[in-house]
């Protein structure tokens, strides 16, 4: 896989800052051009630190009332649970930005997973005005973390959800705790205007190498399936995560 951009920072702190800078830049660009920025958030420690920076150091860099927040996946837990991706984003960023409720489009992790996935699909179809079964939303920016096993969102190796071609969101059950989750599907991710991976730590080095330079095996390395049809991929990582690249 050849990324549109591969950016390697010296350390994690530099990565957090650069990620916040990139998100703020993309947001301002989209708002200037389209009057709105649709941002699909991810969970994890690296995004959390960047979210905190967006709500503090970069608070004045973005017209936040024009940003619509979505999620790439969610653990099936209440929003106040420490494992909740919405809860993390709310604590680190959203609660500090004086947003209107209608700007926040969260997956309802507290509901029954299949029902929550169907409801999220309905919300996406309504917001993006998708009328046909084969239509997919076009987010301005989708943020993705990367699991040690090369999973993205909650699309794990060898999971049937990797092959979903029509639905926008699915309920998945995986071995990693919390085992029940909701995830956007790969066609949604690949319909984005821009996808940005945020990856840090030596534990992710093998996954990064296998996705970017390894043999084609998307069943084993789901990150290889991330190929925006009309958009670009930005890989933003620290030196430790990039240490396996040649």
Model-found features: residue ranges?
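N-terminal glycine-/serine-/threonine-rich phosphate-binding loop
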Residues: 1-39
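Ligand-binding beta-strand-loop-alpha-helix segment within the catalytic cores
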Residues: 1-3, 63-140
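Glycine-rich N-terminal segment of FAD-binding domains in flavoprotein oxidoreductases
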Residues: 32-57
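Glycine-rich beta-strand-to-loop/alpha-helix junction loops that act as flexible
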Residues: 41-46, 144-148, 200
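A short secondary-structure junction signal
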Residues: 117-118, 152-158, 207-211
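Class I SAM-dependent methyltransferase SAM-binding "motif I" and its flanking Rossmann-like core
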Residues: 141-187
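ATP/nucleoside-binding phosphotransfer catalytic cores, i.e., glycine-rich phosphate-binding loops
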Residues: 187, 193-246
